[in-house]
A protein has these predicted regions:
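A membrane-interface helix-boundary motif in multi-pass transporters
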Residues: 1, 178-198
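Helix-loop boundary and gating motifs at the non-cytosolic
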Residues: 36-75, 141
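A late C-terminal transmembrane helix in Major Facilitator Superfamily
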Residues: 157-185
Length: 211
């Protein structure tokens, strides 16, 4: 919902008209696109997939630490508010940032956020962790939209589809299964693992910055 609100405030990827003759459909076009963008896709899959433990088990973990259901709801709401604010101010805040720089910022926020959640359940730190949702999720999504919008022609639509299916869907689904196994055996240690999952994104960022 918060991502939808942010996108309504300002669409990140504007549609571009082109003739049917320019479109190249078929498997070769998709294969070429993935070959050119695999670093980007791997990076965003790690950053978005690292949210799996948070989405699936943070409420259970916090309630087990003594927080009421309403307190957990407020913490989740704080993350949503931070997300919407950054979406609304993104043009002003990140005007000079390319996709590569935004992905670095998101990765740093990811390591910090999941590390905090694995380290403590003290309320002040959980508030910080929830505010960092604007970095782990929103900044990553903004970087993806900036990278995708720099593509040419029908590649924009194709890469948007791959990003939505793989990074926003598949990676989170797979990591949720993995996180469930880890939470059963490691408890809060699953968040440390998520911090480690986000870390390689620093090196996997696409080499060419897309503005």
């Amino acid at each position: 919902l918060s991502m939808l609100l942010g996108m309504l405030l300002r669409p990140s990827v504007m549609p571009q008209g082109e003739s049917r003759q320019q479109e190249s459909a078929g498997w070769p076009a998709w294969r070429s696109l993935v070959a050119q963008s695999w670093r980007f896709l791997a990076c965003v899959c790690l950053l978005q997939g690292a949210h799996a433990a948070y989405y699936g088990f943070s409420a259970i973990y916090w309630q087990g630490a003594g927080y009421s259901a309403s307190a957990v709801g407020y913490l989740w709401s704080l993350g949503v508010v931070a997300e919407v604010i950054i979406f609304a101010l993104s043009n002003r805040l990140f005007r000079r940032f390319g996709a590569r720089e935004l992905l670095l910022l998101s990765a740093i926020c990811g390591v910090a956020r999941w590390g905090i959640m694995g380290w403590t359940t003290e309320l002040p730190w959980l508030i910080v962790a929830q505010i960092l949702h604007c970095g782990t999720f929103t900044v990553c999504h903004l970087a993806a939209m900036r990278y995708i919008s720099a593509r040419k022609g029908s590649d924009v639509i194709r890469l948007q589809a791959v990003y939505s299916a793989v990074a926003m869907g598949g990676s989170i689904a797979i990591m949720t299964v993995f996180a469930g196994f880890l939470y059963q055996h490691l408890g809060h240690g699953v968040f440390w693992v998520m911090a480690l999952v986000a870390l390689p994104a620093v090196l996997l960022r696409p080499r060419v910055a897309a503005h």
